[in-house]
Amino acid sequence: MATHYLSPSILCIILTTLVSIAGAKIPAIIVFGDSSVDSGNNNFISTMARANFEPYGRDFPGGRATGRFCNGRLSSDFTSEAYGLKPTVPAYLDPSYNISDFATGVCFASAGTGYDNSTADVLGVIPLWKEVEYFKEYQSNLSAYLGHRRAAKIIRESLYIVSIGTNDFLENYYTLPDRRSQFSISQYQDFLVEIAEVFLKDIYRLGARKMSFTGISPMGCLPLERVTNLDDPFSCARSYNDLAVDFNGRLRRLVTKLNRELTGIKIYFANPYDIMWDIVTKPNLYGLEISSSACCGTGLFEMGFLCGQDNPLTCSDANKFVFWDAFHPTERTNQIVSDHFFKHLKNLFH
């Protein structure tokens, strides 16, 4: 019988991974969602929804544009670091990472996606069901790397961060005619909640037990929505904010239902509405100055390719701003929001 030996370098990598896993209360952060948590997956698919160019990432370690729709790190990155894991969660499709990197954290999120498959179709990004397929593939690779028992423990003990939903309304329902012709806004919310339930049950069946499930923020206060608010120009669009409150209420009821029905599951509903409303309306309390416009360009409508390095109007200090581009928060805002939720997460999941 042939005897197989692990090379010292491979053995060292595995041992380092195991020590990291053993030393953390949560062994890994596993992320699903949209641009609020996409750490670069869209760099590796054919889509216009990318942020892998300057000035994106200018405050990221090394000043690299990683594909994060931010000047620096995302809330999921800060949560990973707060749990004693690595300071950034790598994108699953990034070939510069491998399963040893993903053993303590992995991101399947895709900027521009939503609960609704038709939302992903708008910009040709990864639909939520495909994120789940990548998760299955990841589980198989993790088992091959660490063995089934140890991999299953990581899957069971990891914290799952889910952040998605805004695009379904702003990119799809209120922009394109198809869903509006099929659903009233109340019916569409119910449709999305049904998809959310199927998704959460799917990852539960795949082993997920600890989840931070994020609602949607006051999307009427995004700079892009302020500038297009015809009823009250440059003010928060109240109808969109009211919708966010309504939708978050439906998501909260879903979380209550699943926590009651699914054995062993614990879902924390991370409702970002109140903290983001507080930051937007009272930025000075958080060491910020400007919330009505963004850092990039004019701060009113630029995001993605419109937020290019040649735009002379881009601010010099993003730490003064709530928003980085017309749709996404700055690194500083992401850190504030992450810190806010971590106070609850650290007591729930350990």
Swiss-Prot record:
Keywords: Glycoprotein, Hydrolase, Lipid degradation, Lipid metabolism, Secreted, Signal. It comes from the Eukaryota. CDD domains: SGNH_plant_lipase_like. GO terms for molecular function: hydrolase activity, acting on ester bonds. The active site is at S35 (nucleophile), D325, H328. It comes from Arabidopsis thaliana (Mouse-ear cress). This is GDSL esterase/lipase At2g42990. It is found in: Secreted. The keyword Glycoprotein applies. Its EC number is 3.1.1.-.
